[in-house]
Each structure stands twice: as structure tokens, then as C-alpha cells.
């Protein structure tokens, strides 16, 4: 049997003293989570023998791999001991005496994590009940708060960290050329899909990928081929302070990290000033996707850290204009390079922008996306109920996705009486099949950058109707852009879709116009080209 560790970069930083029999019983996902935990603890304690007690559960519990709980030799009653394993950092003698005990909890299976328990506290409980029983009312209040925060954020300067004046050569480095990546989590949708693409590009350029993530997750995609031969460390928080600098120092001492590329990773963003001070020759860049008015999100963090960073890559004109025109960053420091070709090759085979709906056929309206508060699937279901009441059998619906609101989506589906008209599809079915059947894709999100599904829909000859958020106006026709606020969104979406259903000739004309708009956006600089040039320079 092939050792699962041979498929990752883990062997570069630690060795297992004796592989136990139970190891072959781990799923590939669990084996890689264990790899990440062992890599972290061996790097945090080079020269010591690490003895890990490995746990798992069937319940909806996230992994615990690097946080302070790993130092406690007790655990909850619903955890099962998988076994124990010993390892030590490579490049150091095997200790003959003494051992450091850690407890690595691999968590529950990915399916159970869709039913995560609420965070503790009455506020979270009340919030969940209100959202479940009255999601539109909840959303109305949420959007009013967003409006206030947006106006406040536009009028206030964002503080910046001090500039780095380090001129020394910095600390010692290893010899293997590498890139340190920061990811949100290992769930490959949206921004993470682009992050995974860059990891493959780094490998193709001859750079070794080192990946850290900082968002709680079961990391269902950690076993994807893109992470083969990479060193992947899924952080769980809070990480003991004394381990942070040791792990980062060990990575830089073992590898020649030519650059850091941050993709939505708060932990790594906040360590950039330290990296700049200790390793000033390392280039620091990020990729930014979306403005988040409620929290500021990653754009605010990037602005705070901009004085120690070399370049910001943005995927939309909206982000470029915000950073340059409103926040005053030098234009040469902000690179616009789009993801128009990430999931669709604009020069490849695409459906003709011609409606395939025959006379008498119902119009098929689709929702494709994660079931999250941001994507607002509950709005789509209420839109479907309105259209069903108004158009009857002349319209049908597909809701394609999964996520943390899955149980609420199913409850809404039943409560609104949509079983006969709205088909629910999971992520086990191809999105391409849904888009082949659809005439219109509705994007009901309350925030986006530029959705990849907009490009995919156009490639399938599907009209896109979208809330007017982020830079969606770059690819969606003005007459198909809808208000962000939920009640105006529902009213406008209902009118637009009734019009498209009743006027097939107009729908066909709009499809041609949409293709032209998408093609114009695709003519902007491409993120693949920008990144390829960057990595080739780092590798030289």
C-alpha cells in the first residue's frame, strides 16, 4: 500500500518513527489533516519527540490540530481514540529520552459539519431562530445595518501599519525555493478555487507550495490532487503564541520562501509585518475579491498591511477604483487581473447566445451557489413562490448547492409548498447539467466580487439576473441588475422574470448583448498571466 504521506510534502519536515497499523484506516482527508497537525507540532518543537493521541467523532465537530486544546490530555465523551503515533522533525537527531504529548482531534465527517452547532450564547440562539422563521425580515434589518456601515466606512480612513525600514539581509533561509500561501479554508469554491489554481501554478514554476489556512472547517477538499506534494497546515485557533514564530521561523529556515501570496487568510495577513522585518527579501502579495461593508473584511486588512506589502492583485475594476481612488494606494501597487477564464475559456467552445427554449416549454430559472447568508437562497425560494403563483406551469426552478443553511432551505422548500416546482440538487451533481437546462440564472447575493457562475452561465447560453452588488455590473446587463435590499429585490426580480418569460424575443436579444459584455470583461488582463509572470520571477 502507498504511504499516504508520500503524496504530500509532509516528509520534508517530519518523520514518523513507526507507522501504526491503524493508519491505513484513515480516509485520505483524515490522513492529510493528521499530516498538517504533526507538521505543525514537529516544527514548533524541533529536536523533540512528538507523541500524538489521534481522535475522531461521528458528530458535527471541527478538527482541533494546532490550538491550545491539543496540549490537554483529556477530551469529550463522544470522541473515539483512533490510535497513537510518534514523529519528530527532519534534520534533527531522534531523541532517545523524553516525549511531548499532543492530542490531535480529526473532527467529524464532512457531511456532519453541515449541521454545525451554534456558537454559545443567547444572541446567536435568538439570531438563528429569527433567521429561520423570518429570513426576509432578518435580511431587511441586516441590509439597513450594511447601508449605515457602508456610509461610515467610506467616510473614515483605515489605519495602516508603519512602513518597514529594514535594510539588512534578514535571517537565514533554506535552499528549496518555495511560496507560502494563506487560504481561508480548504473548501474549493470562489476565492479558494483561484487559490488552488495558484498553488498549481507555483508548482509548475518550480516552487514548492506551503499552505496554511486559518478558518474553522472540516477541509473536505484537502485530499484534492492540487495539494499533492504540498505542505499543508490547517491552523485551528487559538494557536499558542510561543508556537507561531517558531513554526514560521522553521519554515523559512528549511525553505527558501521567495514570496508570500495571501488568499483570504487573516492569520497570515497579521504576520506580514513580522515576516517583512525578519525576512525582508521575501515579496508579499495578496489577491482580493470582494468589498465587505459590514466587517471591512480582507480588503480592510490588506489596506492596514499595505505599507509592508509589495503588490495587491484585484479581480474587478470596482476593487481597483476603491483602493486607488478612495483609499489612495499608488496605482502601480494595484494590479487588476480578472478571473474571467478561471472556470470558462472565453476562446473555447461556448454555446451560441441563442435561446433554446421552444414554444410552449416552461422557462427554467436556476440558483447555483453555497447555501449561506451571503448567497440568500431563501430569497430565491420566495421569488419562485411568487412566480409560480403568477405564471403557473410556464416556469420551473432548480436550486443547486449545499452549505450551512441547507436545513433552512429544505424547511423553506416544504413550508412554501414548492416540492412540485422547485427541484433541489446537491453538490454531487454537476453544475454544468443545471446550466444546460436553465434559461435564466438568478444571483440573489447581498455581496460579491464578480461571480464565476456569471461566466459559466453565459458560456452555456444562460441569461444572468443579479443583485447589483460588487462588480456584477461589469458582466450583467443594466436592465437585469436588481436592488440589493430584499423586498425591492423580490419585486424587481419578479417583474424582470415575468417579462423574460412572456417576451422570448427580448430574452434572445439580451442574451446577445450579455455575450458582448462578458467578452469585453474577458479582454481585461488575466489573473493567470499576472500570476505566472510573478511566480516565474520568484523562481528565477
Language-model features, listed with the residues they occupy:
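Non-catalytic membrane-proximal stalk/linker segments that position and tether the catalytic domains
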Residues: 2-178
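A short, active-site helix/loop in glycosyltransferases that binds the activated sugar's phosphate group
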Residues: 137-138, 296, 309-334
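A conserved mid-protein helix/loop that constitutes part of the nucleotide-sugar donor-binding site
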Residues: 192-197, 367-386, 404-407
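Nucleotide-activated donor-binding/catalytic signature segment of Leloir-type glycosyltransferases, i.e.
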Residues: 229-236, 410-426
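Aromatic "clamp/platform" in nucleotide-sugar-dependent glycosyltransferases that forms part
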Residues: 446
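Short hydrophobic beta-strand element within catalytic cores of glycosyltransferases
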Residues: 463-467, 473
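A charged, aromatic-enriched C-terminal amphipathic alpha-helix characteristic of glycosyltransferases
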Residues: 502-538
